[in-house]
Amino acid sequence: MENYGWNYPYYPYRPPRPNPPYPAPPHHHGSMSHSGPLDHHHPPMSYYASFDYQHQPPPPYPPVSYYASFSSHSDLSYSGRLDSSGHGFTSTASPHSPGMHIVPFGKASLKVLLLHGNLDIWVSCANNLPNLDLFHKTLGVVFGGMTNMIEGQLSKKITSDPYVSISVAGAVIGRTYVISNSENPVWQQHFYVPVAHHAAEVHFVVKDSDAVGSQLIGIVTIPVEQIYSGARIEGTYSIRDSNGKPCKPGATLSLSIQYTSMNKLSVYHSGVGAGPYYQGVPGTYFPLREGGSVTLYQDAHVPEGMLPGIKLGNGMCYEHGKCWHDMFHAICQARRLIYITGWSVWHNVRLVRDKEDPSSECRLGELLRSKSQEGVRVLLLVWDDPTSQNILGYMTDGVMGTHDEETRRFFKDSSVQVLLCPRNAGKRHSWVKQREVGTIYTHHQKNLIVDADAGGNRRKIVAFVGGLDLCDGRYDTPQHPLFRTLQTDHNGDYHNPTFTGNVSGCPREPWHDLHSKIDGPAAYDVLTNFEERWLKAAKPHRINKLKTSYDDALLRIDRIPDILRVLDAPTVSANDPEAWHVQIFRSIDSNSVKGFPKDPKYATSKNLVCGKNVLIDMSIHTAYVKAIRAAQHFIYIENQYFIGSSYDWNAHKDIGANNLIPMEIALKIADKIRAKERFAAYIVIPMWPEGVPTGAATQRILYWQHKTMQMMYGTIYNALVEAGLEDEYSPQDYLNFFCLGNREMVNGNNESGTGSASNENTPQGLCRKSRRFMIYVHSKGMVVDDEYVVIGSANINQRSMEGTRDTEIAMGAYQPQHTWARRQSGPRGQIYGYRMSLWAEHMALLDDCFVEPESLGCVRKVRTVAEENWEQFRSEEVSEMRGHLMKYPVEVDRKGKVRPLPGSEEFPDVGGNVVGSFLAIQENLTI
């Protein structure tokens, strides 16, 4: 299993804004620095007294009720104005002028309202903060090391290191950087934040950053009712302590906040849009690149004739890509560089497995060695699994079995350079945080970058991006065999982590994935990502400074005349029916890349977000939210995980799985129901997370997944009631979850290799007898309205979306000639062909209704096929399955209540509760 998670809140993007709504105060004491990992809504230090830091991490933040005593009915002192005529309180003086007068808001409202849109926030400054650091700075010196003493820091004035966290419904949506040693900090920091929260108040929590945690200084609350009209609230507020009293006489926070609802945000009203003015996803690190080419892949290989032909709108037939075949030939044809990033890279994997192809016996390691001997620069940037070791030649495989040490050893005496890259928290983080990040999180990107022929004796950059690692267990075709290829295509490549012990005669775990190839300017952004990561990972640290530096391994392509630069890269005219516009997104932070601004004040200029001691690119989350909000007809998702929007669950609201994606989908459907318009969401996930389904971690993930489903179906049911449609339609007429599975009969070749007796009452024995197993959905992709596609390495959970956990990369792309806005009807371009090809793979049929996925007829047809396949899968009778798409084994009643499917409370053969169990395991391992 690749993905567990720790429970940190998420941080949205903040596109730049030219000027703050009010001037900065004339004074500022203290130097600026950003420090520490992501913030967790820490209360005073006494709150943590009962926690053993060596055996469990501290809680992320207290529940919302923690703040109730000092946020709900406190008399909030306020000065300033509401930016709409006839509303609010005004001050004729500048918010910072000596003549400013304080006007109380009165009792704060507790009315809960839905904030669905964007918040435009400025946090300007604080004044007269209390000094909380005299005691805790001393502790920081003792526990944080003696370097401060060496540098003479103790001679400086010791006072608070303040920052501000902004939260809605208990979910942190933004935070300022830390300003060291200042009682009058000036941030002038802008936030442009997507929200999809039911909330009564917006909290601005002022904290003091310490080496051993954070202390609560005080809080300012803004009632949602005050901003719901869209008026801008702007002013200076008294900072209150936990008793509702000023934390210090004269302690204030200056801010402004404005809410814009979805119906006023035109960028979300017309999908991709038409014309030259569409700028892609705003507020991201990499821009939209026009005039590229994209190839979309399903599975590692699609043999000729395995899938039916699909007619496109231009009269052409959709061409099914052969991912690993194309990767193999791209490597073979490289002349200058081959760069690979991976969660896992195995030198012994075979990319080509067609019997008639002479390359079928070539191993990846041999190919890369051969290319490096030709003078090609071959660099591998692979996650360093901390549980694998190579000590004095003795290697341990590691818990994840990534082959990292094995692959490094294979290339040891070659010119191929392998850099094993641990997931580091950064030296300015606490020791606890460094251990936490290094042990739990991973480098999860999967890329291949090569130079390719550009004509005229010139070279260009081509990149492959998606979910497929170049390692064992990944090669598969749309047939997803269980037993029949164990002695052929999968000989020496058996992978099924569900089983422990003897696996003789057991089914392999079929692997379904999505990938892409990018040819054009956006490929250079993938190269930039590799270069930024390599330079950061290659930088020597501490004792490693004695080792060889990898800094000079990267090719300087600007000094190689025959490689075209990004501005010179060949492009396709936007009028060409096959043109693509492509944008690269990431989840990554400044601890994993070199090139982010050193001063957090400049984060906004790069569309980065501030965390404690870290700058964050979380543009994958931004891209998903933008695409879902802009969807007009349907959403099709395949993903390895589906967990999020925990702030709106019916329990465990505070675990920190705060990404917006599930809630945005549910609210999109609810909006369409109220508008009496059709909309459908299809979500394909694995039957269970990879591993043992009865295990504590797996059960906890399934439990969170169930909570996510329940929240979404509940939101949809409420919308049906509001529209008076609850008797006519059910929630599953709009949203459905599916999984994939296969079942094979024994053929005459006795391909199964029966092994030990098949009547043993173990998962192995039961699977040998039933000849069935799930197809593992490892995909990380989304299709919206057949006009926009997202494919990458990021799962839909907190660790992939947050930016400070796993490092991720994705591409978002569309064809400008194949959009709803241009055609005024359903697009029939490559994205349409890709989605139809995936459905043909999963259902073994192409129905006429599939061309309109939003239609009720299509939704019910797909659900019927999936229900029939599930019944065939769970039956005692062994039969050959043609289609693989199955109903996820839960029952959703007309009121949106989600329960295990009767008779299928546990997964067939392998056990484990379908809706999971709340077992005693740290939730930060599973979100």
From Swiss-Prot:
Domain annotation C2: ranges: 104-237
Q: Where is the active site?
A: H444, K446, D451, H778, K780, D785
Inducing factors? Activated by wounding, methyl jasmonate, heavy metal, osmotic and salt stresses. Up-regulated by phosphate limitation.
Q: Which InterPro entries does this UniProt record tie to the protein?
A: C2_dom, C2_domain_sf, PLipase_D/transphosphatidylase, PLipase_D_C, PLipase_D_fam, PLipase_D_pln
What PROSITE patterns is this protein classified in? C2 (PS50004), PLD (PS50035)
**GO: which molecular function terms?**
calcium ion binding; phospholipase D activity
Q: CDD domains from the entry?
A: C2_plant_PLD
Reactions catalysed, as given in the entry = a 1,2-diacyl-sn-glycero-3-phosphocholine + H2O = a 1,2-diacyl-sn-glycero-3-phosphate + choline + H(+)
Which chain positions lie within coiled-coil regions? none
Work out whether the entry's keyword set contains Hydrolase: yes
Topology term for the membrane: Peripheral membrane protein
Which keywords accompany this UniProt record? Answer: Calcium, Cytoplasm, Hydrolase, Lipid degradation, Lipid metabolism, Membrane, Metal-binding, Repeat
- Give the cofactor note text: Ca(2+). Requires micromolar level (PIP2-dependent).
Known EC number: 3.1.4.4
Q: Which cofactor does it need?
A: Ca(2+)
Q: Any known activators or inhibitors?
A: Inhibited by neomycin.
Q: What is its main location?
A: cytoplasm
Q: Where in the cell is it found?
A: Cytoplasm; Membrane
Q: What tissue expression does the UniProt record report for this protein?
A: Expressed in stems, and to a lower amount in leaves, flowers and siliques.
Binding-site residues, a 1,2-diacyl-sn-glycero-3-phosphate: H444, Q640, H778
Q: What does this protein do?
A: Hydrolyzes glycerol-phospholipids at the terminal phosphodiesteric bond to generate phosphatidic acids (PA). Plays an important role in various cellular processes, including phytohormone action, vesicular trafficking, secretion, cytoskeletal arrangement, meiosis, tumor promotion, pathogenesis, membrane deterioration and senescence. Can use phosphatidylserine or N-acylphosphatidylethanolamine as substrates.
UniProt comment concerning the protein's domains: C2 domain is a calcium-binding fold, and the binding promotes the protein association with membranes. In PLD beta, all the calcium-coordinating acidic amino acids are conserved.
What is the protein name stated in its UniProt record?
Answer: Phospholipase D beta 2
Q: What is the species listed in this Swiss-Prot or TrEMBL entry?
A: Arabidopsis thaliana
